[in-house]
């Protein structure tokens, strides 16, 4: 049995699909199938049921999954400890994104990591807060940018900044708003987000507190789509204040004069990986980029 057999087993269990597992491991589907077959033959156990819905773990597979994950983690720690003696950080990290690269300062992050850890591979994967958190839990991501509260017991998170939010108003609806009254705003059309989005979790309690529901004309979970729909007059939307103000200066929309709660931008990862050298390296770079005290020297929140 080789470590790559265990890595394949864990990846197929997470993805529940041979093709997706092959893509993650940068290999072919036949190679993935061969690894699973060899492992099952050596263990004399059936690890997966092949179903129309994908690869489902058998009871034996479920029992062995946690042990396989721990074994891989231990092997990774061993390798990093050895490389640490050589002052060289090897490996790779998959970081989930939840907004645009400029706001997250990804160019600076990539430049810093490349300068200080040239052997470290970095993957930036586009997503949303609502997708990134479960992806962290199952190991599909190593770390992620998320917005809002992060009270997941398995995760650590560091606040990078508090972002001011604002309600963006299309030109066509501006004259229909006499004052920033929540009940009156709820009667207007809205470009809304899904419940897993941090923007939804920020805005919905304001409507709930006044016993009203907004008219949801369209769903848009991507910020560029939200901005385009508001500019097109589809409805009101919630966006970062800096973006709405820039769009207002460009004559695309208006900022509603109403104070909203701020939204935390966080960097999150599994709590058990707090001392992982790769995670610590990224957190140290973020500390420098965002002008924060060294986040590796204090507890996460």
Question: Model segments located where?
Answer:
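Short helix-boundary/capping micro-motifs
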Residues: 10-30
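A short LG(V/I)-centered, amphipathic sequence patch enriched
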Residues: 40-62, 79
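Central regulatory/effector-binding core of bacterial HTH transcription factors
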Residues: 90-153, 219
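Hydrophobic hinge/microswitch elements
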Residues: 128-133, 137-141, 146-147, 196, ...
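Flexible hinge/capping segments at coil-to-helix
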Residues: 154-190
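Secondary-structure junction motif
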Residues: 175, 189-210, 275-284, 292-298
